[in-house]
Amino acid sequence: MLDTKFDELMEFPCAFPYKVVGDASSTLADRVVEVVQRHVPGDYAPTSKTSSKGTYNSITIRVTVQSKEQVETLYTELAAIEGVKRVL
């Protein structure tokens, strides 16, 4: 588990934006939503942007998280998606 200070800096529950940057893929947004749904079921409408050269996609998704542990778990699992380079 990550050792963060989210619990000191934030009040839960709260809306938390995740930005997932990965290789350009038509399925990246679906895979991001699938991971989020496992932990925080709901209706999500992620936004997607392709890099200027078309090499990467960035997916932004806003999730209402309930705890520091949920924030950290989502960071870890989103980073484990195949082709993901960064989770911000």
Swiss-Prot record:
| Family matches, as SUPFAM superfamilies | YbeD/HP0495-like
What NCBIfam families is this protein classified in?
Answer: PRK04998.1 (NF003447)
Query: For this UniProt entry, what's an example GO CC term?
Result: cytosol
Cited InterPro entries? UPF0250_YbeD-like, YbeD-like_sf
Gene3D superfamilies per the record? 3.30.70.260
In its UniProt entry, the species of origin is given as: Shewanella sediminis (strain HAW-EB3)
Q: Which Pfam families match?
A: DUF493
Q: What is this protein called?
A: UPF0250 protein Ssed_3490
Q: From which domain of life does this come?
A: Bacteria
Q: What family does this chain come from, according to its entry?
A: Belongs to the UPF0250 family.
